[in-house]
């Protein structure tokens, strides 16, 4: 933005605020919005491809060779699972900093975590998010935001309404269509679309929603899920490209490159529909105090979901011994000082050496 002068600082800050407000991966959504403002829908697509493909291709290649690695390098792959323990713990602390300073947000996060641990299911997660928004509306405070210059070259309001309607239609209709058809590709698309549509906070918060979609169905084992999640920390790009790995290793048909493509498009499609659909209304919507309070409540609720996911499946599937606890703790501390790829490589090497 600074070099090419595509947006001024305030417009860029507004885009970031919008993408933090919406469900989905904020970094990818910012890229889509910039591409949209520069080149319309084609610009948004090209921006998404440029930002997403490098990490997606690396994770797909890893997924295609995963079962070979699992047989030959089981201990090394266990190191990836220990990395996931450290990464999720760090994400909880990072998300928790603005939450723990307010007892109401802390209580909401704790209640959400307890409900998610006690009653683990996708529908409970959806209920927790909805309850978080309602609790935020009633209990939390809003803050005054100043109006700013609108972002240029965005769709009109009619187009925005069509895109938002498409988002909600797919969210409601896909589960019914997939269930009636029994088609695995449709079920796969529905599962990843729903995960992409319901993840507030982006990044690591997608973990519990994806896990509830693919592991109970038997498409991916817990071991595959956590090893892939650990590998996703070692590649550049948005964490949502983890979906490409899951589609590639899925036990259904298609898997491989086709399954990866279905999962990848499905998990990012809600972000595109929401960003392009809400941009025409954002400058007015962001100033409404009830909207601010609802989003604060949702953020506290998704923190609770992440805490629940940290316990199960992350810790319960990864920690087997005191050595695992020490290695995961060391990885957590190293993440404070070193880039994530370096921590992934060092943890995997140590796990492989000491487990053999």
PLM feature spans:
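Multi-pass membrane proteins that catalyze or facilitate reactions on polyprenyl-/lipid-phosphate substrates
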Residues: 1-22, 33-356
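N-terminal cofactor/phosphate-binding cores enriched in small/glycine residues
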Residues: 25
């Amino acid at each position: 933005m600074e070099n090419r002068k595509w947006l001024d600082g305030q417009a860029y800050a507004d885009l970031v605020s919008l993408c933090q407000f919406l469900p989905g991966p904020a970094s990818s959504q910012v890229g889509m919005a910039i591409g949209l403002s520069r080149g319309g829908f084609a610009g948004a697509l090209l921006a998404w491809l440029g930002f997403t493909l490098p990490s997606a291709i690396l994770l797909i290649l890893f997924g295609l060779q995963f079962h070979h690695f699992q047989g030959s390098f089981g201990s090394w792959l266990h190191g990836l699972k220990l990395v996931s323990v450290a990464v999720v713990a760090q994400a909880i602390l990072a998300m928790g900093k603005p939450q723990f300073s307010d007892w109401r947000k802390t209580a909401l996060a704790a209640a959400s975590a307890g409900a998610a641990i006690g009653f683990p299911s996708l529908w409970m997660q959806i209920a927790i998010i909805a309850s978080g928004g309602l609790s935020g509306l009633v209990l939390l405070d809003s803050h005054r935001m100043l109006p700013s210059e609108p972002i240029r070259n965005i769709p009109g309001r009619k187009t925005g309404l069509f895109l938002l309607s498409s988002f909600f239609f797919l969210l409601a209709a896909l589960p019914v269509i997939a269930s009636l058809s029994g088609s695995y590709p449709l079920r796969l698309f529905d599962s990843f679309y729903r995960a992409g549509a319901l993840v507030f906070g982006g990044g690591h918060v997608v973990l519990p929603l994806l896990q509830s979609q693919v592991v109970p169905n038997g498409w991916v084992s817990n071991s595959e899920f956590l090893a892939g999640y650990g590998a996703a920390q070692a590649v550049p790009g948005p964490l949502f490209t983890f979906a490409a790995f899951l589609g590639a290793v899925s036990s259904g048909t298609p898997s491989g490159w086709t399954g990866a493509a279905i999962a990848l498009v499905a998990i990012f499609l809600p972000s595109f529909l929401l960003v392009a659909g809400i941009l025409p209304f954002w400058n007015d919507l962001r100033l409404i105090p009830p909207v601010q309070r609802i989003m604060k409540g949702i953020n506290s609720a998704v923190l609770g979901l992440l805490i629940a996911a940290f316990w199960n499946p992350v810790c319960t599937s990864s920690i087997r011994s005191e050595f695992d606890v020490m290695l995961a703790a060391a990885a957590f501390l190293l993440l404070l000082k070193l880039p994530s790829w370096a921590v992934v490589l060092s943890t995997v090497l140590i796990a492989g050496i000491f487990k053999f």
